[in-house]
Structures are given as structure tokens and as C-alpha cells.
Design a protein with these regions (language model features):
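Composition- and surface-driven signal marking solvent-exposed, interaction-prone regions
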Residues: 25, 74-78, 107-110
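ATP/Mg2+ or Mg2+-diphosphate-binding catalytic cores
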Residues: 88-117
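The catalytic "switch" region of P-loop NTPases
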Residues: 16-19, 28-31, 35-36
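Short acidic-hydrophobic sequence patches enriched in Asp/Glu that either
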Residues: 19-26, 50-54, 112-115
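Short beta-alpha connecting loops at secondary-structure transitions
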Residues: 15, 40-48, 104-109
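Active-site acidic catalytic loop and adjacent metal/ATP-binding pocket
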Residues: 1-25
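Feature representing long, continuous alpha-helical segments
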Residues: 25, 29-32, 56, 60, ...
Length: 117
């Protein structure tokens, strides 16, 4: 994130956001990460959650500008992006685990399996 001099958030930056992509990718992947109070590789499954306050605040800010270029169908379906990307990333971690951890960097043998759960 970029902050102003008072410490307020100016914008969220990510290398994925500067290349062409599907709007659900950017929105969904950000929500998957930002609205979860624990890291994606936390083994504390009981603490995994989805913070609706973060979701609503981000969505409001995002749409304040994005509504100018998004299609109505894209706006209507943004809520599904967060679900889709949580599921999709879980499948990617599981596939990498099954394939011998060849894509994602791991810190221990079961790391991608923990991420997938």
C-alpha cells in the first residue's frame, strides 16, 4: 500500500495490477488476502475468516473509480470474485503440493498442503 504523510492509505499497489488482466483476478485476489485476518499459510484454520468491513470499504473505494469503466455485469458479480479466488488459489497450492512444490516457494515439506487447506 502507498500511504500519505498522515499514514492514510492512498492506494494499493501490486505488480499484478499494472498488467492486463480480468477484473475478477485483481479484485478477488486482493480480497482473498486483505480480508483474511491470518496469513494464507497459517495452520490455525479456526482463525481463518473474511472481514466484511474490509470488503465493504475496499469495494466502495474501488467502485468510486472503477464504475466508470466496468460493465454492469462485472460490478454485479464482484462479490463472487473473492470466493472464486480463494477456491482457485487453494486448488493451485494443492496442485503444486501434489507435483512436488515446483511453482511456489515453500518453507517446509507440507507448506503448500497447509496453504491449500
Amino acid at each position: 500500500m502507498l500511504f500519505d504523510r498522515d499514514g492514510d492509505v492512498l492506494c494499493v499497489i501490486d505488480l499484478d495490477t499494472v498488467m492486463p488482466s480480468f477484473v475478477f483476478s485483481d479484485f478477488g485476489d486482493f480480497m482473498r488476502t486483505a480480508a483474511n485476518p491470518v496469513p494464507e499459510d497459517s495452520p490455525e484454520y479456526d482463525k481463518i475468516d473474511f472481514n466484511m468491513d474490509i470488503y465493504h470499504a475496499f469495494t466502495e473505494g474501488y467502485l468510486s473509480t472503477a464504475k466508470e469503466f466496468l460493465l454492469p455485469v462485472e460490478i454485479e458479480n464482484l462479490p463472487y470474485a473473492a470466493r472464486l479466488f480463494a477456491f482457485m488459489q487453494s486448488v493451485r497450492f494443492l496442485c503444486d503440493y501434489i507435483n512436488g512444490d515446483v511453482y511456489y516457494k515453500v518453507s517446509y515439506p507440507e507448506h503448500n498442503y497447509v496453504r491449500a487447506r
